[in-house]
């Protein structure tokens, strides 16, 4: 090999030789990475199919056990209960395992994102995404408080109201997408606390299309005051729930992917019961909003379809929030009473 010429060109050639050596190392590392990736994909497929088979057999076993349980002799009942508990425990273990395996997206994620794999494969990535979701909720809640306050007390313009409602639509749409991704990654948020964000998205969309007029102005201040109060309560919930979840996770009593919610769950009983009056007041305000809208719909001057279409979601939100919270409180009192009787 000829010696490199002197001057800047020689320096460039020497740098190129060093880069060439590094590039060969990168190529080898990338080759190994692709091999490991193929091995990982095979392991994922094998693990997924094995879990699916096991879950199917567990369901069949649980069904047989349920059918034969009434006819079992009294001495076998304890063994049957023990087997039932073991089956439930195994199903919980499979749930944790599946959080680290690729899975098909649900209907909503498929419609929004297509067939993209949204499963995060490491604990660090899952926790980072969950933490980013919580921060997103906190920052947007503060922004919503400020904007609703501005619209309520400083500006009376349909344009700023529309911007506020558009922000609400975007916020709730984004929440539903992020929550669906978190559920795919092992978060245990479910039931009403997921569904009520879809209802809120619909409600905000209808509010966005409501034209300015007499009916809108009659409901405007009440809605903005409610939005301000709701965002304030959500801020309180995030602040106190995040601290409570941190303590419970440190004690091993909560899952690492558990999220703060805009309601009350059983794990909040210790330390967060002071939030209940704020929550119930907000629930009844939703009922008041629904009744106000139904009353406006009866006004002969009411021509907008948005009045009724906002009333029904507010009523649904009240019923879902109120009875879900009430069920948690009733269940806790029942468990405490049952525990004290045993003692």
Swiss-Prot record:
Transmembrane segments: 133-152, 159-177, 191-209, 219-240, 271-294, 305-330
One GO term describing the cellular component: plasma membrane
UniProt keyword annotations, A-Z: Cell membrane, Endoplasmic reticulum, Membrane, Nucleus, Transmembrane, Transmembrane helix
Topological domain spans for side Cytoplasmic: 1-132, 178-190, 241-270, 331-343
Membrane topology: Multi-pass membrane protein
Predominant subcellular localization, coarse grouping: membrane
Intervals, Extracellular compartment: 153-158, 210-218, 295-304
InterPro entries linked: TMEM120A/B
Location in the cell: Cell membrane; Nucleus inner membrane; Endoplasmic reticulum
GO terms for biological process, alphabetical: detection of mechanical stimulus involved in sensory perception of pain; fat cell differentiation; monoatomic ion transmembrane transport; protein heterooligomerization; protein homooligomerization
GO molecular function: coenzyme A binding; monoatomic ion channel activity
Binding site for CoA: 130, 187-188, 237, 240-241, 283, 332
Family: Belongs to the TMEM120 family.
Function statement: Multifunctional protein involved in mechanosensation, and plays an essential role in lipid metabolism and adipocyte differentiation. May function as an ion channel involved in sensing mechanical stimuli. Mediates the mechanosensitivity of the PKD2-TMEM120A channel complex through direct physical interaction. TMEM120A seems to affect mechanosensation by inhibiting PIEZO2 channels, possibly by altering cellular lipid content.
Quaternary structure and interacting proteins, as annotated: Homodimer. Forms heterooligomer with TMEM120B. Interacts with PKD2; TMEM120A inhibits PKD2 channel activity through the physical association of PKD2 with TMEM120A.
UniProt domain comment: The transmembrane domain (TMD) has structural homology to the very long chain fatty acid elongase 7, ELOVL7, despite low sequence homology between them.
Entry protein name: Transmembrane protein 120A
């Amino acid at each position: 090999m000829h010696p490199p010429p002197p001057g800047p060109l020689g320096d460039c050639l020497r740098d190129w030789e060093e880069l060439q050596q590094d590039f060969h190392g990168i190529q080898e590392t990338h080759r190994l990475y692709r091999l490991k990736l193929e091995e990982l994909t095979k392991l994922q497929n094998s693990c997924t199919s094995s879990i699916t088979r096991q879950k199917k057999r567990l369901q069949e076993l649980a069904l047989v056990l349920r059918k034969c349980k009434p006819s079992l002799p009294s001495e076998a009942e304890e063994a049957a209960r023990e087997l039932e508990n073991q089956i439930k425990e195994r199903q919980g273990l499979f749930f944790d395992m599946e959080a680290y395996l690729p899975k098909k997206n649900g209907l909503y994620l498929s419609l929004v994102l297509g067939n993209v794999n949204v499963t995060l494969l490491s604990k660090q990535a899952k926790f980072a995404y969950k933490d980013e979701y919580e921060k997103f909720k906190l920052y947007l809640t503060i922004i919503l408080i400020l904007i609703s306050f501005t619209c309520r007390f400083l500006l009376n313009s349909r344009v700023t109201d529309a911007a506020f409602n558009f922000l609400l639509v975007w916020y709730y749409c984004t929440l539903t997408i992020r929550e669906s991704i978190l559920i795919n990654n092992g978060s245990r948020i479910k039931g009403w606390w997921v569904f009520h964000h879809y209802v809120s998205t619909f409600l905000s969309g209808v509010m966005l299309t409501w034209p300015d007029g007499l009916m809108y102005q009659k409901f405007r201040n009440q809605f903005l005051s409610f939005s301000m109060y709701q965002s304030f309560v959500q801020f309180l919930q995030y602040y106190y729930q995040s601290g409570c979840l941190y303590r419970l996770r440190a004690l091993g009593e909560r899952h690492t992917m558990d999220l703060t919610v805009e309601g009350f769950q059983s794990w909040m009983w210790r330390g967060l019961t002071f939030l209940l009056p704020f929550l119930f007041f907000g629930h009844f305000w939703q009922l008041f909003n629904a009744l106000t809208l139904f009353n406006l719909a009866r006004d002969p001057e009411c021509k907008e379809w948005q009045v009724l279409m906002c009333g029904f979601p507010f009523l649904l939100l009240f019923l879902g929030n109120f009875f879900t919270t009430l069920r948690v409180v009733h269940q806790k009192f029942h468990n405490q009473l049952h525990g004290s009787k045993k003692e």
